[in-house]
Structures are given as structure tokens and as C-alpha cells.
Amino acid sequence: MLDGFDVLVMSFAASSVAKEWDLLPSEVGILLSAGLFGMAIGSIWLAPYADKIGRRALVLLCLCVITIGMFASAASSDKTQLAGLRFLTGLGIGGMLAALSALVSEYSNDVRRGMSMSILQSGYPLGAIFGGIVSVYLLQNFGWRSLFFFGGLASAVMIPIAFWKLPESIDFMLLGDKAQHKDKISKLAERMNLIKYEISSTSEKAVRQTYRTLLEAKYRLNTLCIWAGYFCLMFSFYFVVSWTPKLLVDAGLTTVQGVSAGIYLQMGGIIGALILGYLTSRFQVTRLTSLYLLLSVFSMVIYGLANLSLVQLMFCASLMGFFLIGAMIGLYTIAPAIYPASLRVTGIGMAIGLGRIGGILAPFLAGYILESGLHQSQSFIVFAAPLLVASLAIWQIRLSRTLS
């Protein structure tokens, strides 16, 4: 839930920050993109360390980075400081998200993996919904800085909880010195009722993996397709979540109504994610995700072009969230299944990182496109088009039956 709030806190605060500092749309776009840029670097640069030091260690490190970034953001005095601190916070979120995705996937069986990932990633829209509700109260009573302070406080609380309760990945421990981790593995196996779980006495050292490995012949097609899927989906998704509240306010709605649309979008996302997770036990996750991406195009076009009442507007926002966030859950389910344990977080991190680059470009480009005079309704069509590419790319991915 933390990443949902931390990522979107700038979107919730955008109108208030722009008013206080008299910012242009393009400057707001930079602030919205700064955190996403940090997430991209964190996913690409920090995430691979989870394949070296462990998933748990990286999650704890990233939680500390997020906490510092959020508290410092609350004290920022100008747009440059805030952009830099949003970048720092994004570093932590990017590394943590990739490590957690691998950790949950590795603790899930093949039948329930889709639902497990759906539950994990539903924390994002839940955090966004909760954050949106809290933001309405905090903005009205304490100003935009209180949003960042609240986020920092929530992150700080999670550090000791994660330290005491978060387990290390068995898959990761099996890659190193098994004798060193024998007791930990045995205790985890016992907690999971794997009574007959046996540990080989031979040590299987992980083969050194690099980003070049992702493009070897056996991974190349799937790697390129998952990269395209992440980039295009994040490009469209972060336009929607970053700009929808502000565009609605600019169109005449109140700030509360604009934030409410963002909340409805995330609520639809939770339903879409859970339904996709349920269906993955019966249908191929690549096919389901491709269909979700295609239907996302139609939902964005309808939202942009239709002349809707307030109630219809909120319903269509929910529909966009249903398909966009549902498709995102599909990608998070697919990515871990492409790579072996020794390469898994590196592969996931690279895919998420490239996706974040799309997410960086979207809010930034949207600011300049809107300044150029493009109508708000037309902007939804422009940013829906990449989803067609994503749908085709994900359809091409071929997965093995098990998570090796």
C-alpha cells in the first residue's frame, strides 16, 4: 500500500503545489515525473542487488530510503528541491517493488501465483484509495506538506515490522551456500507444511548474470515483449493517474471531485486485479492480460470523448482502472515466470524500469501537449494508442508451466 500512496502523493498535491508556487503545466509535469524517474533508476540499478544480497535486505534498505525522501519532501522550499526528493523516494520504491514481486512469486505455487500477485499489487490501488481519502482531509486542514509527512511516517512504521516479519526467499537462499542457510530454510519449509522438503548437501553457486543475459536467445523474444508491454502500459497509465485529477479540476470540477475520480479509478483497479488473478488459474495469463490491454484502449477513448455526467464520469474512471490496473497485475505475474531465480529480480527490475521510463515521459509530455493547445479529450486518445502495441506484444509471450 505504501507504494500506491507514495507514487501518487504528488498527483494528489499537484494542484495545491502549483497554486502555491505558481507553476506552469510543464513544471507540474516535471514534479510528477521526478518520482517515476527515480523508480526507473531504482528498478534498473538497485533491483539487481536483490539477486546478490537477498530480497529481504533490499526491501529493508529501500524502506529507509523512502522514509527519508518523504520526510524531506515535506520540508522542501522550492520546485527543484521537491523534484530531487521525489527522485530519491522513487529510487527506494523502484527497488522495493521489484524485490517484493519476486519474493511473492517465489513463495506462490503455479496455480495460485496469479491470485497471489493480484493480492500483492492490489496494495497499490488500496494505498492510492486510502491516500486519496486521507489527502482530502489533510489538504483541507493542513496543506500539501502534510501529505508527504504522513507518507514518511507510514514508511517509518513499516521498517521494524518488515525487519521482524519479512522472510528471505527460499529460492535465493538455495542459490548460495545451502549449508549456511539450512536452518532458515528448514524452519520456513516447516511453517509452509513442506514436511518432506529436503536440502541437497551440495552447494549450487549462482552463475553470474548480467543484463546481456536477458537478451540471450532463450529469453530474447519474451524479454523484448515484456519490455514493450511495460513501457506502453506505464506510458498510458501514468498519464491517466497523474493528470486526470488536475484535468477535471481545470474543466470545472472541485479539487475534492478531482481527487474522487482518482479514488474511483483505483477502486476499479482493485476489482479488475482480483478478477484477473482469479481467472489466471483457468486461462493463460498472457491472453488475459492482452485482452485487458485492448479493453483499456476503449475505456480511455470513451472517457475522453463522451459527454458524461458526474456519476457517469466516476463510473468510467472505475472502468479505466479496472482494465489498466488489471493489465498491470498481469504483467507483474508474467515477468517473474520468464526468468530463473538467479536472474529473476534483475529481469523484473529491468522491465519495471523501462516501464517507469514510459511513466516518466507521459506526465512530462502531457504537460507540453496540453500547453500546445490539444483538447483534454483528445489527449486521452493520444495516450491510449500505445496500449494497442502492448496488447500485441504480451500476446506473443510464451511461458513454461512452472516457475523454475
Describe the residue ranges of each PLM region:
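Interfacial helix-cap and linker-helix signal at transmembrane-aqueous boundaries
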Residues: 17-18, 49-50, 134-142, 248-249, ...
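Conserved MFS/SLC helix-loop-helix module at the cytosolic interface between two early adjacent transmembrane helices
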Residues: 41-79
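Cytoplasmic helix-loop-helix junction between adjacent transmembrane helices
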Residues: 87-122
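Extracytoplasmic gate region of multi-pass secondary transporters
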Residues: 216-273
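Central mid-sequence intracellular linker of multi-pass
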Residues: 144-204, 392-404
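Helix-breaking motifs and short loop linkers at transmembrane-helix boundaries and internal kinks
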Residues: 22, 54, 75-81, 92, ...
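Glycine-rich segments within core transmembrane alpha-helices of 12-TM secondary carriers
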Residues: 114-140, 154-155, 352-362
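A membrane-interface helix-boundary motif in multi-pass transporters
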Residues: 140-152, 370-385
